[in-house]
């Protein structure tokens, strides 16, 4: 089974477990959603495998987090006491990370999570199951922000950069998606992409995504430049 089909199965499993009362209050995000935002069939087949599902949760404060944990336990999620990731719960053998919009809840967040929740789109995962999905422009912004926090300046080895480049490779409308975003978001994406373009390792990361296909490599760079020069 391809990585994208495995990921869809993972997303469906989590969505079904959450049930109608929780599913619409959470936004699916992260590497497991990359394939849902890609429109190019070739790129879909190149999507990396990831072993966890990420969701943004609209909660404020630690007390709200503990309340959510109790609700999730009823749904079949459990706490793995051996896990170092504070936001992680386990559904059978599947890792599921619930990431709050408020830093006070668990001591971390992503500056774009709150807006990502406010702008999330409905996505029909199956004929009978609809989830809230991060929009492409906020996917890009959250990945850039995540790379700043954990990428250690290594664009070539970063899964965040890999996911980001798969979007630029495989989503034909990504330049228009970002062009229609708020000025703050456009400027942030532009500034971060400029920094990446100045990193010598970034070119190698693009080459890896393009599978050394010169035409695909050129397309990726053209789309990135289109988002940098958005005015």
Regions found by a protein language model. Give the residues of each.
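Compositionally biased terminal segments of proteins
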Residues: 1-231
């Amino acid at each position: 089974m391809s990585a994208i089909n495995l990921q869809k199965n993972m997303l469906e499993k989590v969505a079904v477990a959450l049930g109608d009362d929780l599913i619409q209050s959470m936004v699916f995000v992260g590497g497991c959603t990359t394939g849902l935002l890609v429109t190019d069939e070739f790129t879909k087949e190149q999507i990396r495998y990831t072993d966890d599902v990420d969701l943004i949760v609209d909660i404020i404060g630690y007390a709200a987090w503990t309340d959510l944990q109790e609700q999730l336990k009823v749904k079949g999620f459990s706490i793995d006491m051996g896990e170092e990731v504070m936001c992680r719960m386990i559904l059978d053998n599947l890792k599921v990370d619930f990431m709050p919009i408020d830093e006070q809840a668990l001591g971390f967040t992503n500056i774009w999570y709150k807006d990502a929740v406010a702008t999330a789109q409905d996505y029909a995962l199956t004929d009978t199951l609809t989830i809230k999905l991060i929009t492409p422009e906020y996917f890009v912004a959250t990945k850039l922000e995540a790379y700043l926090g954990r990428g250690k300046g290594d664009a070539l080895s970063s899964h965040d950069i890999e996911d980001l480049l798969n979007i630029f490779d495989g989503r034909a409308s990504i330049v228009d998606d970002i062009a229609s975003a708020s000025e703050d978001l456009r400027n942030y994406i532009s500034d971060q992409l400029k920094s990446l373009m100045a990193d010598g390792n970034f070119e190698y990361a693009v080459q890896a995504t393009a599978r050394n296909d010169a035409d695909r490599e050129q397309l990726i760079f053209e789309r990135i430049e289109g988002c940098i020069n958005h005015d």
